[in-house]
């Protein structure tokens, strides 16, 4: 059985007690058991001189099933964050549903941050197609402007974009450049149709990276920078598996420097 140090034990116990008291909760036996299992498992990880895992056995993998009402998210997040900080590793929490991601990012992690002494930053990882490409947006609007000029000469011709689409694109431009929107499709105040979003969504084929004139104001790379400085990264299973399939560290932290939690 893995042995957890007194310091690690006190760190987790103190923060759990602080979290319970701040929220007015009572300790649950099943939650405490789950916290202990995860803490002991991570405490048993042996690192080599380069900070990499020295033991390749499966003893540092836990499969935990807990009933409704356990408080599973806190039961894995609190000890995993504490141990990741202790081991100087990143924590990647992977979920199956958008709802659970939003619960983590908007409720559970802010709650832990505010009601414990754990000093950590977190970010939500998404595929690049969820972000606005400023260059594509500007090019689309330039096309609209040129088409409008042509129509004054040839009024019988139709614009390539519907009026409603033009209004959508102009609104995106105003909101993003005005700082009222971060370029994430999911944080838009209004829905945008798939075809309209596809016109301006970031994609690998058209992205020129640091060579782009809009690189310093790129929504995608701002989000990627946030991931690099985050201690806890929330993602979905598809993104995690795709990143690992590409060798790792394309979007998410390097796998050898990470602790992974797969929630359902």
Explain the meaning of each model-derived region.
Residues 64-76:
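Glycine-rich P-loop/Walker A and Walker A-like loops and their local beta1-loop-alpha1 context
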Residues 39-41, 74-87, 107-111:
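Walker A/P-loop NTP-binding motif
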Residues 2-17, 21, 26, 50-58, ...:
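A substrate-engagement module of RecA-like helicase motors
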Residues 214-224, 237-255:
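Conserved RecA-like ASCE ATPase "motif II neighborhood" in helicase/translocase motors
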Residues 25-51:
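N-terminal pre-P-loop "Q-motif" helix
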Residues 255-264:
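SF2 helicase catalytic motif II
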